[in-house]
């Protein structure tokens, strides 16, 4: 799925089932990871931060990988939810319909979980950049954290929309528990990072 920013926004606004919230969440997460990469690159090139240049170089490589992973999850979510839409389109009198829907729901729950997991890893890098990157770029670190937080929460809503309809409750509850653990771990940390940046900006002002 290769679109301009305008094209992606128009695709989201269209009266079509995909792309939807899951794909949008993946893209927002990719923006957060990309901001992390930018901060790390500036830091690695800054002579004043030469003592941590190796760490910063590793960080931007990791951030680039996460951004690419999240961009790929935009398309993966589209494909997965496309299977759900196709399954619901099977005639109701077809005995294969129920199984097809359930199989598709399970497939569609996986990209949102992977989006959440990638955003958690990006948030860990952003926390590191708050400590090791340039003070002048702390607001960019915080923006990245806010984006990854929003992406994680958005992806969780997409995941829950799928698990709610799953008949295999054991599988659904396992996914929901894993999702809740990510939310409980990372949302407060993202909020703390944003507050830290806001406080620092006000002190400089």
Protein language model features and the residues they cover:
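Short, hydrophobic/aliphatic alpha-helical segments
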Residues: 1-19
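Amphipathic, well-ordered alpha-helical segments in soluble domains
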Residues: 8, 31-38, 73, 80, ...
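Conserved phosphate/anionic-ligand binding catalytic regions in large, soluble enzymes, centered on
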Residues: 14-37, 137-155
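Alpha-helical scaffold segments that form or flank carboxylate-/histidine-based iron centers
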Residues: 17, 58-65, 108, 140-145
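Transmembrane signal-anchor/signal-peptide helices with a preference for the extracytoplasmic
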Residues: 38-50
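A structural-propensity feature for long, helix-poor, extended segments
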Residues: 47-86
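Amphipathic alpha-helical interface segments
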Residues: 77-146, 150, 162
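Preference for long, well-ordered alpha-helical segments
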Residues: 115, 122-125, 136-205
């Amino acid at each position: 799925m290769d679109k301009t920013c305008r094209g992606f926004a128009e695709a989201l606004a269209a009266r079509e089932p995909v792309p939807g919230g899951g794909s949008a969440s993946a893209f927002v997460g990719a923006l957060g990871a990309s901001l992390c990469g930018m901060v790390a690159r500036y830091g690695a090139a800054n002579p004043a931060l030469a003592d941590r240049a190796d760490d910063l170089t590793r960080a931007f490589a990791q951030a680039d990988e996460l951004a690419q992973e999240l961009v790929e999850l935009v398309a993966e979510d589209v494909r997965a939810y496309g299977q759900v839409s196709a399954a619901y389109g099977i005639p109701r009198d077809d005995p294969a319909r129920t199984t097809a829907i359930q199989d598709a729901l399970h497939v569609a729950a996986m990209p949102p979980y992977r989006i959440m997991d990638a955003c958690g890893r990006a948030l860990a890098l952003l926390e590191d950049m708050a400590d090791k990157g340039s003070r002048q770029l702390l607001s960019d670190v915080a923006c990245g954290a806010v984006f990854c937080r929003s992406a994680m929460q958005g992806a969780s809503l997409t995941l829950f929309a799928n698990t709610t309809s799953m008949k295999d409750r054991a599988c659904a509850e396992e996914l929901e528990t894993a999702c809740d653990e990510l939310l409980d771990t990372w949302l407060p940390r993202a909020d703390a990072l944003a507050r830290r940046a806001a406080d620092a900006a006000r002190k400089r002002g």
